[in-house]
């Protein structure tokens, strides 16, 4: 495990922040740098069929070291970091034997406090890797990458029995494009696991059904002094639309299996306003009902408008709950749970209040639940990971490979 931390620190030193609204994939040059580094490292380790596609998907195979018809399985992580917070000049702090209390992040006023993040109370005595308060850390998902790379090394060095192990590193997961250019046939695994979760023990195979809603509102602007009966204020229409959206079904009011409507952005003038919502729900019927609700609201608010003024609503599905695909193959979850228990970890099955590459891949024919990385507070300057959590993730990956080798196709 001595190289696990070294690998992680190496990977987070590269700025791989992805960028939304960009046609090219990967969306940023920094992602290519990490992909080329990983390709070189995989080749040096002796993996075969190492390929890097023109869309930035890196794949490789660790060949089986035992005979028999053992199913090929995969492990997947993404190279990009969130657009929500800078990933440039990441300067990790290593806090050994955490004794509790606030951790100063760099030389400013930022702290990592157990008052705000009570999970710290459970991590006494562990080694924490934090930010310096100026950037995110990049544990999402460079912890996953380091864990997969280290697990490959452990399987080789200890000659642990395993079948074919496929690995893949994808770009632009944070902007929803990670799986769009993933060649499932070329990957050629029976099932896979993304290593992109949170705290130790998390095992996730349920995620939101997701859709985006874009609303274009065209009004009519005239001088306010002569506006009666003529002006149609697009901003007022936008306000009326949002007032119709259930206020108690927003992200800040929901948790667990509860879905939500989220107004992510709004801009405009009297003439023209644009609103962008995201809709999330675990239940497919409720998901469809939420989309209908948005259409009904737009129709209600737009009723009776002058023909030159209108409300246009476009709904686009983003991804679906992988549960309906993964539950068709219960052994995938059973093996992961057994692997965790064999590593003295109690599995924590919980829904992902978000999405992963695995959600899309599951609907592309590759069932793909999500394993923990040992990281917390992703997408911001309070992000951190524990070295012990990362070590546990490596152990679980290795044990999954070992258990799968005991299972014949």
Swiss-Prot record:
The keyword Membrane does not apply. Belongs to the peptidase M20B family. GO terms for molecular function: metallopeptidase activity; tripeptide aminopeptidase activity; zinc ion binding. It comes from the Bacteria. Pfam families: M20_dimer, Peptidase_M20. The keyword rRNA-binding does not apply. Cleaves the N-terminal amino acid of tripeptides. GO terms for biological process: peptide catabolic process; proteolysis. It is found in: Cytoplasm. Its EC number is 3.4.11.4. Zn(2+) 1 binds at residues 78, 140, 196. This is Peptidase T. It catalyses: Release of the N-terminal residue from a tripeptide. One of its GO terms (cellular component) is cytosol. Zn(2+) 2 binds at residues 140, 174, 379. Keywords: Aminopeptidase, Cytoplasm, Hydrolase, Metal-binding, Metalloprotease, Protease, Zinc. CDD domains: M20_peptT (cd03892). It comes from Escherichia coli (strain SE11).
